[in-house]
Amino acid sequence: EITKGLQNRHISLWQSHGKYYKNDKGEWGWQRPRLFCTTEDLFTQSFILPYVIPMLENAGANVYTPRERDTQKNEVIVDNDTRNGSIYLEMKSRKARWEKTDGYGFAQRKPVYEDGENPFLTGSARFTRTEKKKNKAFAEWIPTIPETGSYAVYVSYQTLPNSVSDAKYLVFHKGGVTEFKVNQRIGGGTWVYLGTFEFDKGSNDYGMVVLSNESSENGVICADAVRFGGGMGNISRGTVSGLPRYLEGARYSA
């Protein structure tokens, strides 16, 4: 545990501008001019993503980027509403069972979204009460990875009146198991980045995310979708950009 530095600090950081849809021209374009064989939209993130953000995170900070940070073109979303070839599982305990929340949750109902549509308002989310003992109730997201490689892992949930600040997530990947404690009192209804890990192609028991109801607090944990990989842009403004999502502007990312 980091006891000094940026521990428990939250930082919002834009890596650069990104491509956007120009209404006056009816086409996608960069927000900054081309200069010396590049553009600021591309050049700035070439050092923000691999160097500056990891430096801040290694100092203890939680870094939120309104733009996509993962350069992985593939994307897999595992959700309780739409499985899409992957697996979502729930295990209840003697004292805790999974239930549907009263509010909206994420659901991937379509491959392309029009301006103003929000997939976090088209599905449902799940919740259960917390327990202080280990290995009680849990939820599992097991993706079918299309190609061996590096994938960012994002979780989503709803922030509820009695959400806890230490929801326990376990990411199983090629390098082992990494544990995270997520404050579900904030960040509901969007993608919360955990980390980037190596995964093998296919569906594997060493390639998944687990949410446990073990907590030091009395309250509830919430489970919604988990996303693996940055993916391709899927917001249509006249048409989709045809680019990986990390090259698009913040408007087109959650």
Question: Can you say where each PLM-predicted feature lies in the sequence?
Answer:
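Short beta-strand-plus-loop segments that form exposed binding edges in beta-rich domains
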Residues: V209-V220
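Glycine- and acidic-residue-enriched helix-capping/strand-helix junction motifs
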Residues: N23-F47
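Non-catalytic propeptide/linker segments at domain boundaries
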Residues: E1-G29, G229-S253
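Extracellular carbohydrate recognition and processing domains
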Residues: K174-S203
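Short, surface-exposed beta-strand/strand-loop-strand elements in extracellular ectodomains
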Residues: T159-T178
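Extracellular beta-strand elements of beta-rich domains used
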Residues: L194, D224-F228
